[in-house]
A protein has these predicted regions:
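C-terminal charged interaction modules
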Residues: 82-143
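Short amphipathic alpha-helical coiled-coil/interface segments
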Residues: 68-73
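Short, surface-exposed loop/turn segments at secondary-structure junctions
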Residues: 52-63, 90-95
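Surface-exposed polar/charged interaction patches
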Residues: 44-47, 51-58, 79-82, 114, ...
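Intrinsic disorder/low-structure terminal segments
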Residues: 5, 12, 22, 79, ...
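Short N-terminal mixed-charge amphipathic segments
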Residues: 1-58
Length: 143
């Protein structure tokens, strides 16, 4: 049987050397899930801050923090359809701060930057490639 192979745009990325994820950074379905997940996590971040400020008992705070950490890890793992959080964050809470932002935010912003960069690059490559094939097959067009 003959086999046809084509470029799907699927790219595998090593994330901080801890794990790998694969996605097509120009896939609108993935990008929509990425932005929806980011917005939901951002909303939960605001709720998290407000709730932690309300709680006074340390044990209640820690229980709440663990619950929210697990919830957010599930959302991030769901975005990539594979468990990535344990490898990326280990025992660190995803609300931990690094470079002024929660670590979950740093991770998703890095993915968003890759999406933006790749999309711009692919857009530039698309028009010349289409023109090349249009010219190639133009000679077969009936007049």
């Amino acid at each position: 049987m003959k086999e046809l192979n084509f470029e799907s745009g699927l790219v595998t990325y090593s994330i901080n050397g801890a794990c790998e994820v694969s996605f097509n950074p120009t896939d609108s379905n993935f990008v929509e899930r990425l932005y929806s997940t980011f917005e939901e996590l951002d909303r939960k971040q605001d709720e998290y801050k407000a709730q932690v400020e309300k709680l006074s008992d340390k044990r209640e705070i820690f229980d709440y923090v663990h619950e929210r950490d697990a919830e957010m890890r599930g959302m991030i793992d769901g975005l990539f359809a594979t468990p990535v959080c344990d490898a990326l964050f280990g025992n660190m809470n995803v609300y931990a701060i690094a470079n002024g932002l929660p670590v979950w935010c740093n991770f998703l912003l890095a993915v968003m930057d890759e999406v933006d960069t790749t999309f711009a690059k692919e857009q530039k490559a698309t028009n010349p490639r289409i023109a090349k094939y249009t010219a190639k097959y133009q000679k077969y067009r009936r007049k």
